Amino acid sequence: AMTGSYSCMTLIATLIFDTASIDQKAAWVEQIAKMGEEVIEREQEIADYLACDFNRVTYLGSGSFGGLAQESQLKILELAHGLVATSYDTSMGYRHGPKSFVDDKTLVFVFVNNDEYTRQYDLDILNEIGGDEIAMKTIAVQQDDKTVFGGESFTFKGYNLLPEGYLALPFVLVAQTVSLLNSVRVGNTPDTPS
């Protein structure tokens, strides 16, 4: 399903264009590898998010995570052969019309940014969607547990805060795991994407 290609291309582009030192980049890559292992170890937690009768998934993110939201919704759409409706947007843009996509069969995932200012938009939409009490589940995907949010959260704890480009990789692994598990859930084989 080309998940490895996406991840490798993203990592290579990030490493090429990032102006940080080689040593700093190496430390960040080592950290994202550990975070990736953590996603695999916590697969059941992700499976628990999907243990409900949903038929829609929305991914939201701010800054670089807006593009990550697009890739994430594309992967679930592809691996489910369109059996699950998907949408994506930025955290700020979602409330201006696209939020009408949410119904009581919708899972909403929000990639929470580490930037303090940008993070406010992510938290605002998490709380707004949760407060609407329409979505089946609203799930924050985040690196630390500073999020004040009443919904569910897949949180990477105990790591140094990463820049967006690097944090996108463990975040996308969460989304790829959602896509894989959903593919099996709808009776599709992940090796034959549409």
Language-model-detected regions and their locations in the chain:
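A SIS-like phosphosugar-recognition module
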Residues: A1-S194
